[in-house]
C-alpha cells in the first residue's frame, strides 16, 4: 500500500515533465498500462517505449493533477489534466482518470479512462 507521500512524489515528477523518471522509479518490472479498453502494454520496457514515443510525438506538454488524490489501500485514482501541442502544431487539452493498483511503492497495474474525442484541436 503506497503512502500519500509516495504518491505525491510520483505526481510531482509527472507534473515536472519527468514521466520517464517516474516510470523508472515507481512502476514494477512487470507492470501493465492500459488505455481505456485497449490491450494492455506489459513490462517496464514496453511501458517506457510507449511513454517515450508519446513524448516524442508532442511538444510543450504540461500535466496537472487535480486534487484530491484518492487512495484506498492498494488502489490510487488520480485525475490528470494535460495540455500539449500535437505533431500538426495544434493545441490539445484533455483530462483522464488514472486507476492504479500498487504493491508497496510500485505501480503494478494502471488503466486510463478518458474520452478519445478530447484529442481534437481546441476551437
Predicted segment positions?
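A short, polar/proline- and glycine-enriched secondary-structure boundary/capping micro-motif
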Residues: 45, 88-90, 118-123
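Short, surface-exposed coil-to-beta transition loops
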Residues: 62-65, 79, 92-98
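A short hydrophobic beta-strand element
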Residues: 72-82
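Hydrophobic beta-strand positions in extracellular immunoglobulin-like domains
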Residues: 82-84, 102
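Short beta-strand edge/turn micro-motifs at domain boundaries
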Residues: 95-121
Amino acid at each position: 500500500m503506497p503512502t500519500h507521500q509516495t504518491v505525491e512524489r510520483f505526481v510531482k515528477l509527472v507534473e515536472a515533465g519527468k514521466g520517464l523518471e517516474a516510470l523508472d522509479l515507481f512502476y514494477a518490472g512487470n507492470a501493465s498500462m492500459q488505455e481505456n479498453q485497449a490491450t494492455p502494454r506489459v513490462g517496464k520496457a514496453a511501458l517506457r517505449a510507449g511513454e517515450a514515443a508519446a513524448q516524442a510525438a508532442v511538444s510543450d506538454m504540461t500535466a496537472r493533477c487535480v486534487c484530491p488524490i484518492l487512495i484506498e489501500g492498494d488502489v490510487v485514482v488520480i485525475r490528470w489534466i494535460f495540455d500539449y501541442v500535437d505533431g500538426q502544431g495544434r493545441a490539445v487539452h484533455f483530462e483522464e482518470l488514472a486507476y492504479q493498483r500498487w504493491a508497496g511503492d510500485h505501480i503494478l497495474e494502471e488503466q486510463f479512462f478518458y474520452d478519445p474525442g478530447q484529442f481534437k484541436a481546441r476551437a
